[in-house]
Amino acid sequence: ELLDSLGSIKQTYDEHIVPSLDDPLQLRLFNTYRSYLYPENCPVPLTLHSDNRGSLFEGIKTLNGGQGFFSTTHSGIIRGRHYHRFKVERFLVVSGQADIRIRRMFDDKVVTFSVRGNEPCFVDIPTLHTHEIQNTGTEELLTFFWSHELFNPDNPDTIASAVILEEN
């Protein structure tokens, strides 16, 4: 049964679809599977559909919802510097360029993904990995973020933690 669940998660995720995460065990299996894929399979390239109206790409497909939001970030500014214990989170740069830096908790190795809005891709943030996004361009950075759950200010599952550790 466990192997079937993991196989189903893999098949769904291979199609860039986030599986149903209503069941706590399925959520934990999905987070474990994403952790297994990281960092070799990041960022994940997406298909850019363009015509005379402009361009479109599908960044998030999910079987059970969640919350998406956009942010703008001024040149040189860093957002984040925190980690999550359970939250499934996806970053998609829509316009501009950025470095997404991720560090596994209790490790000092930082993985950096340089991404651009004109080269659509997503980066899923593994649980228990502190992360940040920095606008590395001169223009405003526009980023779409998605989480599998609605934000709850009484239980945010967001713990402050530096990505780049200071050397002593």
PLM feature spans:
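Mid/C-terminal beta-alpha module of Rossmann-like enzyme folds, strongest
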Residues: 1-46
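A short glycine-rich, His/Asp/Glu-containing loop-to-beta-strand
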Residues: 42, 46-81
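Short beta-strand His + acidic residue motifs that chelate non-heme Fe in jelly-roll/DSBH
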Residues: 56, 80-82, 100-102, 123-125, ...
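A short beta-loop-beta micro-motif enriched in histidine and acidic residues
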Residues: 77-90, 117-119
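Glycine- and acidic-residue-biased ligand/ion/polar-headgroup-sensing regions
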Residues: 86-105
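Short acidic-glycine-tyrosine-enriched beta hairpin
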Residues: 104-128, 134, 142
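Double-stranded beta-helix
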Residues: 107-109, 136-168
